[in-house]
Amino acid sequence: MIKSELVQIVAARNPHLYHRDVENIVNAVLDEITDALASGNRVELRGFGAFSVKNRPSRTGRNPRTGDTVFVEEKWVPFFKTGKELRERLNPGMDDEDDGDAD
């Protein structure tokens, strides 16, 4: 699903709202999540999951074309950890022994 499809679905479920307003709301929510992550904050949507940023330290890598070693600088990467309700909905009937951490 892409953002425009999400806007269409939300607008269809809420016929009292204009499509333009739904698009503005979706964009505002995504902008706020992005701004929070850019500030180093964690964004938790209870039951759905939590967005955060993790540091990927610098390392020595390899150029796949030439085989030469290259230095890869450290960087911050977005990370998403699923919430319990989302994991249960994706895996009905399974025990919740895994914490859903993709590390």
UniProtKB/Swiss-Prot annotation:
Keywords noted in UniProt: DNA recombination, DNA-binding, Transcription, Transcription regulation, Translation regulation
Highest taxon of the lineage: Bacteria
A Pfam cross-reference name: Bac_DNA_binding
GO terms of biological process kind: DNA recombination; regulation of DNA-templated transcription; regulation of translation
GO molecular function, one term: DNA binding
GO cellular component terms listed in the entry, alphabetical order: chromosome; cytosol
InterPro entries: Hist_DNA-bd, Histone-like_DNA-bd_CS, IHF-like_DNA-bd_dom_sf, IHF_beta
Function field: This protein is one of the two subunits of integration host factor, a specific DNA-binding protein that functions in genetic recombination as well as in transcriptional and translational control.
PANTHER family: DNA-BINDING PROTEIN HU, INTEGRATION HOST FACTOR SUBUNIT BETA
Subunit structure: Heterodimer of an alpha and a beta chain.
Similarity comment: Belongs to the bacterial histone-like protein family.
Protein name, UniProt field: Integration host factor subunit beta
Organism listed in the record: Allorhizobium ampelinum (strain ATCC BAA-846 / DSM 112012 / S4) (Agrobacterium vitis (strain S4))
